[in-house]
Amino acid sequence: MRNLAHPILFVVLDGVGDRPTPGYGNKTPLEAASTPNLDNLAAKGRTGIVYTVKRGVAPESDAGVFSLLSYDPTRLELSRGVVEAIGSGIEFNPGDLALRCNFATAQGGQIVDRRAGRNVSPDEAAQLVEAVNTNEKLRGLIDFELKSTIGHRCALVFRGRAMRLSAAISNLDPAYERQGKITIAKTGVKLPAPIPKCVPLNKTTVARRTAHILNQFASLVNSVLKDHKVNVSRIERGDQPANFLLMRDAGTKTPNVKTLKQKFGFRGVAVADMPVELGIAKVIGIDTRIFPPDRSLEGYSQRGVEALRLMGDYDLVYVHLKGPDEPGHDGDFEGKKKAIEDIDAGFFSRLGDLSSSFLCVTADHSTPCLAKGHTDDPVPLLISGPGVRSDGSMRFTEAYAKKGKFGTIKHGYEIMRILRRLSTSIA
């Protein structure tokens, strides 16, 4: 049973933030999209903009989501690799080394596609993972487990039983780099780009050894995959081969945090499909409802119906909708606009009367189509519910949010404090 009289529905539109785009009337995808349901909600609530981590940081989703859920990622021992391993169900023990991976396309010493065309099927991924997991040379190098998650994405865990491993290593991925305790998206990265080498980030023997193992592992994986029958077939039909494994965001520890219930007394649940959000939910001690990665109107509708049902039992229902992020990465303005419209028509249309509940809608980061990656642009924020006065916003867009009464919120972790204050001030 929930504790709050007025539950909170917290909806994150992955990567929805964008920039005015020439050729589309200098509009953003949110501005160009038809979103009558979101706009109706915006007219009833209050808006603003938020830097999900902080100004100047282009966060990955893990840092953005942790922050939105009240945890300052710059103070955590945060690893996307560990979070995804936990979310995908791989056994992870202290001392193991976990990494987030992509099947990618390498050619002539360069990465030409970080996602192997973004069309690796579940069957193809399963065959490629099996080839890696059963290779004797790789097994002779180190004990490990590679698991396919969704599409080109994988989680990888090196077992630390036989030797010490270090997370103080650079990413073997040209698009992301470590900055302090978090990973940020690099700006201005263009492909093809040279295959990066993993290097130690300190002078310890264990960091040097771990970096050396990763470089050996990457080279051996490439030799295993380049002539695999899956890739022979992909090349024959004109697709990019999935012949390289990008590895990033190493970690050896699970983030040590108070649960959401310990912090706020909230009983929470996450509705999600991606391993990173599911892993975060497990780390902060909230329940999960797992959906297949269905971006159709029906898929969004099912999530809306489930969110409403869960609000009868939980204080906080967190819903993560991936749709807008991928077309942003692909520079596909029309695709991102359609994803937003589908979410409005499928998900938000099912919510009905939320006058006795609190609604928060925002994003974990911006993924502008012109940038084709994450940026540090602030994202729009909408909060509505009992006692929240309308500020006159007519639409849920970046431009209206900049004029909203919440103003500029400097850190995403401030949002949960606002929601707690609102939810506990209404009898």
Predicted regions and their residues:
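Feature captures the catalytic ectodomains and active-site-proximal regions of enzymes
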Residues: 1-427
